[in-house]
Structure formats: structure tokens, C-alpha cells
Regions:
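N-terminal catalytic or cofactor-binding beta/alpha core of small enzyme domains
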Residues: 1-333
Length: 333
């Protein structure tokens, strides 16, 4: 079911949805200053696009189908390819790592989250969603690693980031981008990424990077520690709602646990390089996405929506006084 049709419950297509090339990327404009990005939940694997391999390549040929082609069932004979491997070391480039693992159920969580947010506030977040499987294109990497030379994948990549830029332009004043992901780390905590590495958080050294919430820090005259693990940090609010999170007052740093600091989307579209729109990456553990079943997933998505409402009220001048308290959900995780 198309995302906007899910939100409205209407059988007829809704006119304000915007689609990229062959419908691989979907943008549903909202009417508030929150953007939800879901880059790794797609399932489409069109056979006319090459899979992303474990090593980046300098060039790759792709047969691009005509507009209107059945991209799900297309049967296209591809030309022989000549692939050239990059030989220089990429070990120090964190963006160069090639992963093709999908973040399952992140789209489903986003649907419930957005619907709950709108029901609570009367305002709908902007949504940008990639329907391609990550084995075809990864919006959370620089284009050379996202597409590996595939021209169609490069076009889809540009669609994704252009839609985020369009959503940001539609925000008047400060705003927030939430980039939704999934991870399978053993600690089963929600990992909240502001671009600080695990080492920086462990050492409480916040001077080595400009965070993706720099606008928030400037506007409210806060120190990084306040927004990372203060009582009214996003991690603090998630913990109060019953969900283990890092960083948070309970766990201000990851220690030896694995931790994702925020990727290309957070770096590119947050306020680390200026602007009023911040970005935060949320890495959701497998137990909340699928291991404990659909009821836990749905409850979590609703609770996350209410936490975001509270966070937006606190830091982004949102008047959502009719919102139901997160504590009324009674969630524990």
C-alpha cells in the first residue's frame, strides 16, 4: 500500500505524493517542521539494476527501462559489463563500507509513527522513503558508494536527497530530520546519533566534531552534554517512556558496546555545516522492530511519535498542547 494511502485510509491515489524515478523514492509533503527519512527499508530489487558488491567500482553499465515500465517484473537483457575495481585503500573512510542489509520493518514503524503524530497534533511530518532494496542503492552513503557507478542508482540517490532538501525548504524556521534505521547489536538499545563517535562519547570530548544539532544548541544556549544525555535529551525522553537508549542519562556513552554515530544523511542534512534544520539518526534494535512481534513494534512506534512530539514542543517551538502524555501509554522495554 502506498504510504500516503495508508495514512489517509483512502482508496484513491492522493495527489500530493511525489515520486522519483520509477517510483523508487516517495516523498509525502507534510505541514510541520519534522521530517522522517527511511532510507533502508525498501524491498524492490529490479533485475535491470546491478547489485551493489562488497567493493566499490569506478564504472558500471546499467540498462535503464523506459518510463512506465513494470519495474518489479521487468525482464531486461543486460549488456556485458566491464568492471574496474578501485585499488586504493578505503579502510579509513567510514562512508566507504558497503552494506546490503536492509533495515526491516523501519517503513512499517514510520507509517505508524507519522499517523500517530498527526492524530496527536493535527500536523503531519514530511516523509522521504526509499523503496529500493539496499542491495541496489544506499542513500546513506556518498554517491560513489551509494550507487557504485550505476547511472540509474545515481539518479535515484539524487531523488532521495533532493526530496529531503525540498522538505527542508518547506520548513519555516527551525526543524528536525529524524533518520530511521535498524541494527542488531546485542545490547538492544536505541542508538541516537549526533555525529559524535563512540570514542568521543566515552571520553566526553565534544570538541572534535560539529554535531548535527548545532542549530538546537545555539538557539537554546545548551552544552553538548545537555542534549546528549541530559534529562530533557531525546535519550532521556526515550528512557522515561521505557526504552533503553544511548546516549541518555542512564547510559551517557556506549562503553564497549557497538554504536552508530550517524551517517551520510545526518551529516549532509543536519546543521553541522549551517542552517536551522537539525538531524538525528535513530538506530532501532531488532527486538523493537521484529523479534518481539507486531504488537511491541506498533506500541513502540506510537510511543516514539509521542516522544518526538514532546521533543519538538521543547526545542522547536511547536504548539501541540493537545498531545496525550507519553506516560499514558504505560510502555516498558
Amino acid at each position: 500500500m502506498p504510504f500516503l494511502q495508508f495514512l489517509t485510509g483512502e482508496d484513491e491515489p492522493v495527489s500530493d505524493v511525489k515520486l522519483g524515478i520509477h517510483g523508487f523514492v516517495e516523498y509525502i509533503p507534510g505541514n510541520t517542521n519534522l521530517v522522517i527519512s527511511v532510507p533502508h527499508g525498501g524491498e524492490m530489487r529490479p533485475p535491470f539494476m546491478d547489485d551493489r558488491d562488497k567493493k566499490p567500482k569506478t564504472t558500471r553499465n546499467t540498462v535503464v527501462p523506459p518510463p512506465g515500465a513494470d519495474v518489479k517484473n521487468a525482464n531486461v537483457n543486460k549488456d556485458d559489463e566491464s568492471l574496474v575495481l578501485i585499488t586504493e585503500s578505503l579502510e579509513d573512510d567510514t562512508h566507504s563500507k558497503i552494506s546490503v542489509v536492509a533495515d526491516i520493518f523501519t517503513q512499517e514503524i514510520a507509517k505508524i509513527l507519522v499517523k500517530e503524530y498527526e492524530e496527536c497534533t493535527g500536523r503531519r511530518p514530511h516523509v522521504v522513503m526509499d523503496h529500493l532494496h539496499r542491495c541496489k542503492m544506499d542513500p546513506n552513503r556518498p554517491i560513489q558508494y551509494a550507487a557504485l557507478g550505476d547511472k540509474l542508482a545515481e539518479g535515484v540517490f539524487k531523488n532521495y536527497h533532493n526530496f529531503i532538501s525540498e522538505a527542508k525548504k518547506n520548513i519555516d524556521g527551525p526543524g528536525l530530520l529524524i533518520d530511521l534505521h535498524g541494527q542488531n547489536h546485542h545490547q538492544n538499545s536505541i542508538e541516537i546519533g549526533y555525529l559524535y563517535t563512540r570514542g568521543m562519547l566515552n571520553q566526553e570530548d565534544y570538541s572534535l566534531v560539529t554535531p548535527s544539532v548545532s542549530s538546537l544548541l545555539r538557539r537554546h544556549q545548551l552544552q553538548p552534554a545537555d542534549i546528549l544525555h541530559g534529562d530533557e535529551s531525546l535519550g532521556g525522553m526515550m528512557e522515561e517512556a521505557g526504552y533503553r537508549s544511548c546516549p541518555s542519562p542512564r547510559q551517557p556513552s556506549p562503553g564497549e558496546d557497538k554504536y552508530y554515530k550517524g551517517g551520510y544523511i545526518t551529516q549532509t542534512h543536519g546543521s553541522s555545516s549551517g542552517g536551522e534544520v537539525d538531524a538525528i539518526q535513530l538506530e532501532l534494535p531488532s527486538e523493537l522492530r521484529h523479534e518481539r512481534g507486531p504488537e511491541v513494534r506498533e506500541r513502540f512506534a506510537r510511543d516514539l511519535a509521542r516522544v518526538l512530539v514532546r521533543f519538538m514542543q521543547k526545542y522547536y517551538a511547536c504548539d501541540n498542547s493537545n498531545v496525550i502524555s507519553v506516560s499514558e501509554t504505560g510502555s516498558t522495554t
